[in-house]
Amino acid sequence: MLEDEYQLDFFKNNGFVRKQCQKCGTFFWTRDPERNTCGDAPCDPYSFIGSPVFSREFNISEMREYYLSFFEARGHTRINRYPVVARWRDDIYLTIASIADFQPFVTSGQVPPPANPLTISQPCIRLNDLDSVGRSGRHLTNFEMMAHHAFNRRDNEIYWKEHTLELCDELLNSLKVNPLAVTYKEEPWAGGGNAGPCVEVIVHGLELATLVFMDLKTDKKGDIEIKGETYSKMDNYIVDTGYGLERFVWASRGSPTIYDALFPGIVNELMGLAGIEHELNDSEYANILAQNARLAGFMDVSEKANLMELRKKVASSIGMTVDKLSAIMEPVEKVYAITDHTRCLTFMLGDGIIPSNVKAGYLARLVLRRTLRMMKDLDIRIPLSEIVDMHIKNMPEYPGFRENFPVIQDILESEEEKFNTTMERGRRIIQKSASHFKKTGEKIPLSQLTELYDSHGIPPEMAKEVAAEIGVGVEFPDNFYSIIGELHNKAEEKEEEVNPYAERLKHLPKTKRRFYDEPTRLEFEAVVLDVFDNHVVLDNTFFYAEGGGQPADIGTIVAEDTVYRVVDVQVYEGVILHTIENPGKELAITKGELITGKVDEKRRMTLARHHTATHIVNDAARKVLGKHIWQAGAQKFEDHSRLDLSHYKHISPEEIRQIELLANRTVMENKRVVTEWMPRTEAEQVYGFGLYQGGVPPGEKIRIVKVGDDVEACGGTHCTSTGIIGPIKILKTERIQDGVERIEFAAGTAAVRAMQKLESLLVDSSKTLSVPPEHLPVSVDRFFGEWKDLKKENERLKEELARSRVYRMLGDASEVSGLKVITEQVSGADSLELQKIATELLKTENVVALLASDFEGVKIVASAGEKAMKCGVNAGNLVREMSKIVGGGGGGKPALAMGGGTDPTRIQDALTRGLELVKTAACKEA
């Protein structure tokens, strides 16, 4: 459908011919009339290995600078890179391409670009090819996309397809690339809600660049279909190019793999630690590795590609068995993958991602644990942080990583401990799961394998090993990690909020929010635009509508001397609804009427204090805990607020004290709270993406709030200066999920009340112990020590009592077919006491004990000695039947079981029933 898009003067005027690849069927453009394939792997092998493509070698820094300078000299503005965690997006977690920096606001035309045209070298992370990393010789999880972008409008074109191709060809010519070796492959592109024609730039089997001409947007009613989605034309159209920095370096060096080109020192170090460096010096091994490298393009593990079949292709081409090739290549490929993954982790953690079980943190842990698993396979016994440190030493252009290394190191050590714990308990979990499938004769399915990984962190390789010991197979696809990465790569699509009043409100203008202009004003006049049910719409308002974790204002509306209480305020597509406390009759308010509104001052100020304090506590936490701290959620109430922070371990009491001290210092400095509306692009350039701690607001302009050193895009109400907040008191902290710590605090009068409450508890405790408050710690320690001693003595006496009871019970036991049967109600005994007695009685092999107690309902315990069990007595069956009589249930093992119920009046009936069952089950032999 896009075929006409490629009929360009650039191709016609520069000696290109359009051909169709004889292997994959794709159309491409070439200057070589003899060429019949598209040039891309696997249609063509890598022919640049050992034969570099460019006239000189480049390292990463040199290549990046060459590219950016090339485009700067041709009218492009160089801009700084964005983080690899997409803080400005709510639809994806990671920056997957340079164009992601500008989606959705710039690409949609809502916001101007930071420069036009521009050039950038953007670090990216993609995990959809995770299983090909290390194997194909070219795949990376973390790569830099060098790019130049032009943002065109129908009335203002910067440049389009012709000039983009001219620039690409000029760049390759400047690097002395043989023009006959270059192919431009036609391939439609789609991503991030946009699409368009695309040209892939191939040289000697390697895709060096992708030139996308984005002029389509997703549209359910669109008439253009690409990859199963329908699209329509955009008002603007964008040049979206991506040149692979690492691939350019590889092509310049002709190394066996991209990993050898980028990280030769780290690869050699890991080869040595894995004990395979000596093999690389062997001429036969070196020859096999070289041949494998040229054919590694086959090793693209995808949903349709089977790893063993791909390996067979390469083995056949080399002329050796697949088993021998696998034995040689798998350790080497794992070293390559570890090298790649650790650089990926350097960017992830360096840019502030905290490993966890959700969102970007899940993806970081996915890469991290896959790395640890491969290190375990190769018996590489160094901390993960040592390899990350090697990468940081090679990246002086990222000084923030070195500055943040202590935190990165701490995170990695913590994650290694968690991984080792998972491995220890994982074996039992797998054995249980495998036993279930062994009974059914089935393999452990992919769904269960995914569940084991997602819920318990158990790697599929481990599941396969343990299941094999039990004789159970596992459905373990070669692209398992790619599947997992793809499942968790995108944010969950938010359900579109249904506007129940859409029809009613669609013709009304947006309500003017005057509380932004005059934050201290609480009384105002407004014109009524609409009234329905118990809702009122005004032309302007000082009532804050609920949003951003802040509850709505309340107050009153006065109309014709009637006072109406406003109990809720909500906003729907810019129109604010004021909800009146149910009047029980139709509101006597009419359209066009002038009303007086009054906001409840106490609630407004309390919430403003807590909202402003949230900014301060967040900033203090970042200063104390590290720059990785990111707001994961916040909610303000009248009596307290809570702030959720991304953090990799529990916040210590000392850290809490430091955070509280810093927060109150900011309050006492009485700094002015500054608010201003700024163009989004300008705000991002000035303040960075920390602006979006509380979420990403829409619009070309965003409201910036500066509280002390904290600067955020925020739409809430705030104090005009920090001194108005009053004291800030942290009430408690807790871990609400892996990787997220919650701080609860109070501000202003609420903080004073909280401190008074704590003081009352202190005074009451002092009175109880008859000591002054300052002596409480010593007294509590003393009483606690005495309590522990008494508890031990109590346990000793209980055991002694149990033994004496055992002797008496044995003397009172009934004889049943050579067995001694004890049936007794032990008043007031809990389950543990009954269990101790029953366990003691187990030492006598011909004893059956049936014990019951009226403690908290009914407790029942039964035990059967070895001889009793041989005679057919089963304690589990006895407890099950006895528990039914007292209105409960229970069970256990043949030797010892526990149960109970709710009806203590039937205890004797239960004991009698137990005795009958013993008589029925017991052997007749003495």
Swiss-Prot record:
The entry's keywords: Aminoacyl-tRNA synthetase, ATP-binding, Cytoplasm, Ligase, Metal-binding, Nucleotide-binding, Protein biosynthesis, RNA-binding, tRNA-binding, Zinc
Originating organism: Methanosarcina mazei (strain ATCC BAA-159 / DSM 3647 / Goe1 / Go1 / JCM 11833 / OCM 88) (Methanosarcina frisia)
Its job: Catalyzes the attachment of alanine to tRNA(Ala) in a two-step reaction: alanine is first activated by ATP to form Ala-AMP and then transferred to the acceptor end of tRNA(Ala). Also edits incorrectly charged Ser-tRNA(Ala) and Gly-tRNA(Ala) via its editing domain.
Protein's name according to its UniProt entry: Alanine--tRNA ligase
Main location: cytoplasm
Secretion signal span: none
Family: Belongs to the class-II aminoacyl-tRNA synthetase family.
Gene name of the encoded protein: alaS
GO cellular component: cytoplasm
Transmembrane helix listed as a keyword: no
Superkingdom of origin organism: Archaea
Xref: PROSITE patterns: AA_TRNA_LIGASE_II_ALA
Catalytic activity: tRNA(Ala) + L-alanine + ATP = L-alanyl-tRNA(Ala) + AMP + diphosphate
Compartments it resides in: Cytoplasm
EC number(s) per entry: 6.1.1.7
Any GO MF annotation of the entry: tRNA binding
Single GO biological process annotation from the record: alanyl-tRNA aminoacylation
Cofactor(s) annotated in UniProt: Zn(2+)
